[in-house]
Regions:
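Conserved Nudix-box catalytic region and its N-terminal flanking loop in Nudix hydrolases
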Residues: 7, 12-64, 78-80, 100-115
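Actinobacteria-biased recognition of intrinsically disordered, low-complexity terminal regions
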Residues: 1-16, 21-26, 150-152, 159-166
Length: 166
């Protein structure tokens, strides 16, 4: 995948996958859903695809346009780079797919210069929701999309500082 924002000589080669957490608000409770049930959805991205556009297109094809698609983190897993996304959908879009409440999880912690030894899906989603909570307060576009009950549901997700430097 060639990124036109990188200087010559810098390139991303090898498989890139999108890990999509489809999240919706069931009353006051955040839930995870998707075509494979309450689990992340793994998509192989083509070299020519922009990851955000690809996730938006694929989610739209499955359930209709999402309220929001945002990349929240990345990691290397075996031979691929995994880009994690939270795709926010409405309740009507979640109908017909298995869904489950999202439990809280401890964040995966790393050293100052190394990635965590292991990262679970629940930790990735926890990080993603904390990221979304921060954006809902700090980013005009996200704040316009995630109003009222979304703001209330995300209020408990507080970003934490990077502990390895303090």
């Amino acid at each position: 995948m060639r990124d036109s924002h990188l200087p010559d000589g810098w390139d991303v080669e090898g498989p890139v996958r999108a890990e999509v957490f489809m999240v919706w608000l069931n009353g006051e409770r955040l839930e995870l859903t998707g075509p494979d049930g309450a689990a992340p959805w793994i998509l192989q991205l083509a070299d020519s695809e922009h990851p955000v556009e690809a996730v938006d297109r694929i989610v739209s094809g499955l359930v209709g346009p999402p309220l929001l698609v945002h990349s929240t983190s990345w990691r290397r897993d075996r031979a691929a780079v995994i880009l994690s996304f939270v795709a926010v959908i409405g309740p009507e879009q979640a109908s017909g797919m298995a869904s489950a409440p999202i439990p809280r999880a401890e964040l995966a912690r790393s050293d100052a210069t190394r990635a965590p030894a292991s990262i679970g899906h629940s930790q990735v989603l926890e990080h993603g929701l904390r990221h979304l909570a921060w954006l809902a307060q700090d980013d005009e576009v996200v704040a316009e999309r995630l109003t009222g009950a979304w703001q209330d549901a995300l209020a408990a997700y507080v970003p934490e500082p990077f502990r390895s430097l303090g």
